[in-house]
């Protein structure tokens, strides 16, 4: 099972009525409304966090400047072309919004969350750096920060317990997934962020094409 959302929302990058659709309106972030088994990240619900269009949510817009406070997001692992790969170390494994600004401790913005991959409770993210930043300028385990309002609890993406009622979980964030390396890009069975195509297990699979599947390199 993969990180496939459902409903009318999700993470729309380009328009249409929802889904984690990166430009069109048909092949979108699919899935069931009410959760299900397997410990995967399932989207759902209305809204979501789009890059442009959709039904509202965290849309890409003009930067509003640094937040009032920042909290720890993760640590630098290694560069990847012009981006950087980091280990997520948020409190309680909270998940950052896609495209959320990433800061140094002094609130200087270095870039934005670009991809997420790894296991559900042990995941990584890449940062698309700002034009004035160089991937080679960061040190191993250097810490990065985020606006606490740009984080969602992991529970938003887990299956709902049997018998629990309420709106579908998900509709939260995602990342393009896809595999930038890091300490465990694919992960084993049982749930996680997968960068490759096909395979068993489940969780954050990223990339182009229909659904939130692997982008490859």
From Swiss-Prot:
GO molecular function, one term: telomerase RNA binding
Keywords for this protein: Isopeptide bond, Nucleus, Repeat, Ribonucleoprotein, Ribosome biogenesis, RNA-binding, rRNA processing, Ubl conjugation
GO biological process: snoRNA guided rRNA pseudouridine synthesis; telomere maintenance via telomerase
Subcellular location as annotated: Nucleus, Nucleolus; Nucleus, Cajal body
Stretches for region Disordered: 1-65, 156-217
Transmembrane spans: none
Cellular compartments per GO CC: box H/ACA scaRNP complex; box H/ACA snoRNP complex; box H/ACA telomerase RNP complex; chromosome, telomeric region; fibrillar center; nucleoplasm; telomerase holoenzyme complex
Function according to Swiss-Prot or TrEMBL: Required for ribosome biogenesis and telomere maintenance. Part of the H/ACA small nucleolar ribonucleoprotein (H/ACA snoRNP) complex, which catalyzes pseudouridylation of rRNA. This involves the isomerization of uridine such that the ribose is subsequently attached to C5, instead of the normal N1. Each rRNA can contain up to 100 pseudouridine ('psi') residues, which may serve to stabilize the conformation of rRNAs. May also be required for correct processing or intranuclear trafficking of TERC, the RNA component of the telomerase reverse transcriptase (TERT) holoenzyme.
Domain notes: Interaction with SMN1 requires at least one of the RGG-box regions.
Family stated for the protein in its record: Belongs to the GAR1 family.
Subunit and partners: Part of the H/ACA small nucleolar ribonucleoprotein (H/ACA snoRNP) complex, which contains NHP2/NOLA2, GAR1/NOLA1, NOP10/NOLA3, and DKC1/NOLA4, which is presumed to be the catalytic subunit. The complex contains a stable core formed by binding of one or two NOP10-DKC1 heterodimers to NHP2; GAR1 subsequently binds to this core via DKC1. The complex binds a box H/ACA small nucleolar RNA (snoRNA), which may target the specific site of modification within the RNA substrate. The complex also interacts with TERC, which contains a 3'-terminal domain related to the box H/ACA snoRNAs.
This protein's name: H/ACA ribonucleoprotein complex subunit 1
Annotated organism of origin: Homo sapiens (Human)
Lineage: Eukaryota, Metazoa, Chordata, Craniata, Vertebrata
Record gene name: GAR1
